[in-house]
């Protein structure tokens, strides 16, 4: 890949600012506010802890992937055709259907596969805005980008295990429970294993950031990268996992991908150049609505099909996350395709 510029989205500087500023700032502000109860010792009720996750069904979370049927063809060719709709449909049918079946036959491996897939996807979800919105100059090779994906994805997926091992175990166990599975006492929950994981991941975080600082000619962008990384380290270490992941999913990961999906829609570029973000956002909402509704209907089918249907808020939220898992695998395929076309990978 070398040091050649990244061929991301063809936006003017004004249009890029219109997208980037709210997409980045919303995450910074929301994460900071959401950390306050934990930092000040306030205990949230179960309803409050699960509220962001429940809200994600309609607020950015589910919709950010529901736009795949349009985002992929727009990124690849700039136009949407029946052929492209069929391509995305087949991706979801084959990958999502296969993964859904895996939950019924091997729920515990499927649950940990979800953690691994999400680690990759949330890492790649932060790579794009670093390159396009912050214009970092030190992620100029695939190994450096892969290292950043490893760190950024590990913040929401690994750090909660370090800070809240028992809650982490209960969440993963709740994934498998509707399908008759149980996590049990795996080595990853052993205190010594977690200690070594924490030391290794902290060292890797410092090493990746230090390497970027040595290479950058734009220290301001690097400082934002480092500040985001530190913010997320603290957030996921001190905030209970379900609440932390729900907030992050809604207002950090999903919002940044929504901005990316808007960026590949050429019809809204004039609005972005004029400084208008509300019009493009409304268009996104309309376009994402049909597939969001279809995904929620699929959730109802999943609820009916599992051997042990949920009876509590916790188990219901866990099954919702299984639905997210089933949809995440084909979504990762779509985003990876976009990454290849746009020069991110």
From Swiss-Prot:
The keyword Transcription does not apply. Fe cation binds at residues 64, 121, 253, 257. Its EC number is 1.13.11.63. Signal peptide: none annotated. Its main location: membrane. The chain crosses the membrane at residues 24-44, 52-72, 85-105, 111-131, 146-166, 171-191, 192-212, 231-251, 286-306, 318-338. It is a multi-pass membrane protein. GO terms for biological process: carotene catabolic process; retinal metabolic process. GO terms for cellular component: plasma membrane. One of its GO terms (molecular function) is beta-carotene 15,15'-dioxygenase activity. HAMAP family: Beta_carotene_diox (MF_02093). Belongs to the Brp/Blh beta-carotene diooxygenase family. This is Probable beta-carotene 15,15'-dioxygenase Blh. The gene is blh.
């Amino acid at each position: 890949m070398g040091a050649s510029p990244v061929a991301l989205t063809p936006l003017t500087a004004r249009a890029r600012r219109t997208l980037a500023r709210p997409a980045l700032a919303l995450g910074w502000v929301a994460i900071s506010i959401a950390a306050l109860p934990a930092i000040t010792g306030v205990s949230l009720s179960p309803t409050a802890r699960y509220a962001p996750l429940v809200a994600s069904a309609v607020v950015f979370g589910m919709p950010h992937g529901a736009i795949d049927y349009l985002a992929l063809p727009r990124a690849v060719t700039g136009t949407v055709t029946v052929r492209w709709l069929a391509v995305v449909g087949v991706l979801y049918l084959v990958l999502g259907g296969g993964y859904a079946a895996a939950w019924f036959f091997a729920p515990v491996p499927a649950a940990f596969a979800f953690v691994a897939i999400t680690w990759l996807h949330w890492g790649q979800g932060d790579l794009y805005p670093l390159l396009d919105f912050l214009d970092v100059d030190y992620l100029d090779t695939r190994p450096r980008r892969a290292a950043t994906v490893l760190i950024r994805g590990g913040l929401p997926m690994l750090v909660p295990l370090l800070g809240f091992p028992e809650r982490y175990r209960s969440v993963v166990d709740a994934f498998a429970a509707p399908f008759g599975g149980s996590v049990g006492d795996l080595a990853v929950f052993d205190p010594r294993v977690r200690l070594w994981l924490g030391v290794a991941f902290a060292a890797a975080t410092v090493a990746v950031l230090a390497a970027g600082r040595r290479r950058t000619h734009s220290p301001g962008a690097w400082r934002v990268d480092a500040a985001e990384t530190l913010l997320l380290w603290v957030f996921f270490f001190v905030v209970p996992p379900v609440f932390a992941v729900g907030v992050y999913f809604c207002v950090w990961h999903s919002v940044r991908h929504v901005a990316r999906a808007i960026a590949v829609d050429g019809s809204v570029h004039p609005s972005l150049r004029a400084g208008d973000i509300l019009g493009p956002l409304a268009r996104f909402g309309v376009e994402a609505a049909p597939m969001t509704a279809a995904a929620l209907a699929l959730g109802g089918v999943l609820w009916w099909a599992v051997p042990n249907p949920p009876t509590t808020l916790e188990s219901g939220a866990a099954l919702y996350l299984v639905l997210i898992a089933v949809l995440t695998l084909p979504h990762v395929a779509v985003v990876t395709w976009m990454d290849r076309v746009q020069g991110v990978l």
